Amino acid sequence: MIEPDTKDWTWVLDEVCPDCGYAAPEVDPAGIGATIRDNAQGWLAVLAQPGATERPDPATWSPLEYACHVRDVNRKFTERLHLMLDQDDPHFENWDQDATALASRYDLQDPAVVGPELAEAAETVASLYDDLAHAGEQTRSRRGFRSDGAAFTVDSLGRYHLHDLVHHAHDVRDFVARATVAAYDGDAAAYRDGTWELNDGVRAELDWFAGAVGPGGAVLEIGSAGGRDALALEERGLRVRRTDVTPAFVELMRSQGHEADLLDPLTDELGGPHDGVWASACLLHVAREDLPLVLTRLAGATRPGGALGMSLKEGDGEGWSTHGHVRAPRRFTYWREEPLRAALAEAGWRVEQLTHGVGGNGQEWIVTRAVRC
């Protein structure tokens, strides 16, 4: 049985949410609409996954039920924004989300229907936030009152609304990860063929890594994909354990005569101690709150003095993207130098060099050379 949520969540307007990491004071009002659209794209991907209608336990909503709630949240906040813009100091009718879930039978709704409904509701409210992004202070300070007396301005309502969406995406983060794996699964061969050529930047990192590991060194490769980098490392005299979280990539490598393991660095046994870990352009799919643990686990599987070669996309926040050789959306986490350095140090890595670069499509990257402390 689902336990009703009776908490007053207005504190998230002033404090960082310890569960999902949402920081309302840092939200740029001009970006709320785009974030809501990105959130909706994620729910479409989640609802397409097998098992999305199943509850992980009797007391927790299924991804489908969360999606129904997010759809209705977007509709409700559209309604409340219009009230605040059209009336002076309106009072919102009480909305019991748990009663709504039961009355509407969220558990029996069709994901193929809920997804488009959620996307439509998201676009409607996102467009409204877009229109308000550059509104004057008088408009942004218009007030509305919840039935319990809690007061919101147009500005604070948007920040409060966004937390609800971010938090529930966090609630189904396992399905978010599955959706990204499924995207690669669907286009594994196309991705391998389209990314097979090494560029000069990657060659330079491979050369450094091979020198740091030493001849004959044992390497754990995370995210081997089609096996391009593993071959390059072997050509440089290293022994490589090929791994990937995507089943289709593992099958591709095995079909080419290589041993390869299906492995999730967040949860699976890593073996070791290895002389080095190569993780090029793969840990960018790891959720922000999970990367410190992954880095710690990789350090634990590496001998002292062993090397880490890693590259991540540079930027802020997270987002879904459909680009390149993979047709379905994938979830990316973007990093800045300072928090990345802190995560590496806390995990037991000493940064030897951290450089910033720009890829062929204009994407900024952070490339890290580190050594196990």
At which residue positions do the language-model features occur?
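Acidic/histidine-rich alpha-helical segments that form the ligand environment
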Residues: 38-39, 43-47, 100-142, 161
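Class I (Rossmann-like) S-adenosyl-L-methionine-dependent methyltransferase catalytic domain
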Residues: 177-220, 225-272, 289-293, 297-300, ...
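Conserved acidic residues
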Residues: 275
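Short catalytic micro-motifs in class I SAM-dependent methyltransferases
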Residues: 281-285
